[in-house]
Regions:
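A short loop-to-beta-strand scaffold at the N-terminal edge of the catalytic core in hydrolase folds
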Residues: 12-20
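Conserved HGGG/HGGXW glycine-rich cap/lid loop of the alpha/beta-hydrolase fold
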Residues: 20-60
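Short N-terminal helix/helix-N-cap motif within the alpha/beta-hydrolase-1
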Residues: 38-43, 60-63, 102, 125-126, ...
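Active-site loop/oxyanion-hole signature of alpha/beta-hydrolase fold enzymes
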Residues: 52-93, 97
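Flexible "cap/lid" loop of the alpha/beta hydrolase fold
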Residues: 106, 114-143
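Conserved alpha/beta-hydrolase catalytic His-Asp/Glu region
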Residues: 126, 146-198
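Conserved serine/cysteine hydrolase catalytic core
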Residues: 174-225, 235
Length: 260
């Protein structure tokens, strides 16, 4: 397995943290979701190599109050991160809110060689936010709800291997980023954000833990239908929102697709 290296540099006058490992060319770009960090992707980096940044507001990347914690802001971050490292093409893997990478991919489909979506927030018509997200989207109520995000509550939510890192970085800056992201993302905006998914014509794989309490498995088919190229579907009935922790064997399935 490849050794995973941690990096901290400065981008836009604030810390930028990412993990990397030697591997495939073009590299795999792994984008994490809420409320975790690039730590999600260590088992993949060890197998495929690649890059996994902490998105702004999460992990060890900057959490300034004046950051743009919107879909458009994260889209610009992905572009800036790749430009900073002078990377032209990638194999893209996105989980949950890592789906912001699809905004970048729709603008630059020629820069994406392969695509894997794993229980990704639907940039599609018909999605309705889950109950916790609806609370977060409400002014004042969301702040109160964050107050109930205790150590015990987060432990019940996350796969055990991710808990320590997520809790260590689940500070006021991360909570602010989460609230701003959800509040700037009404359901109709999600659907509009995916209007050009058909422009992404590279080979794709859509992986779904069907026991996800946040996103219904029907959106796996919806994503496969919306993408412009051939998309392989993999449903995992016995897995949840982070399916590779419930079914570690899926890591090898995704790895084989990425490096084929």
């Amino acid at each position: 397995m490849a050794a995973v290296t941690e990096h901290t540099e400065t981008l836009h006058e604030q810390p930028l943290f990412w993990r990397s490992a030697q591997g495939a060319d073009p590299p795999v770009l792994y984008l994490h979701g809420v409320p975790t960090s690039s730590a999600d992707w260590v088992p993949f980096l060890e197998r495929t190599g690649g890059l996994a940044p902490d998105l702004p507001g999460f992990g060890r990347t900057g959490k300034r109050g004046d950051n743009d914690y919107t879909m458009a802001g994260y889209d610009r971050f992905v572009e800036a991160f790749l430009d900073h490292l002078e990377i032209e093409r990638v194999r893209l893997v996105a989980h949950d809110w890592g789906v912001v990478g699809l905004l970048w991919a729709q603008r630059f489909p020629e820069r994406v060689e392969r695509l894997v979506l794993v229980n990704a927030v639907p940039l599609l018509p018909g999605y309705r936010w889950h109950p916790v997200a609806r609370l977060w989207r409400m002014p004042a109520v969301g702040e109160v709800a964050m107050g109930f995000a205790t150590r015990a509550a987060l432990r019940r939510t996350l796969p055990q291997p991710l808990f320590d890192d997520a809790w260590r970085h689940f500070d006021q800056g991360t909570q602010r980023a989460i609230l701003r992201l959800y509040r700037s993302s009404p359901e109709d905006a999600l659907a509009r954000a995916g209007l050009d998914l058909g422009a992404i014509e590279c080979p794709a794989m859509v992986v779904w833990g069907d026991s996800d309490r946040y996103i219904h498995s029907r959106f796996a088919e919806a994503y496969a239908d919306a993408l412009g190229g051939q998309a392989e579907l993999l449903h995992l009935p016995d897995a949840g929102h982070w399916p590779w922790y419930d079914r570690p064997d899926v890591i090898d399935r995704i790895t084989a697709f990425l490096v084929d």
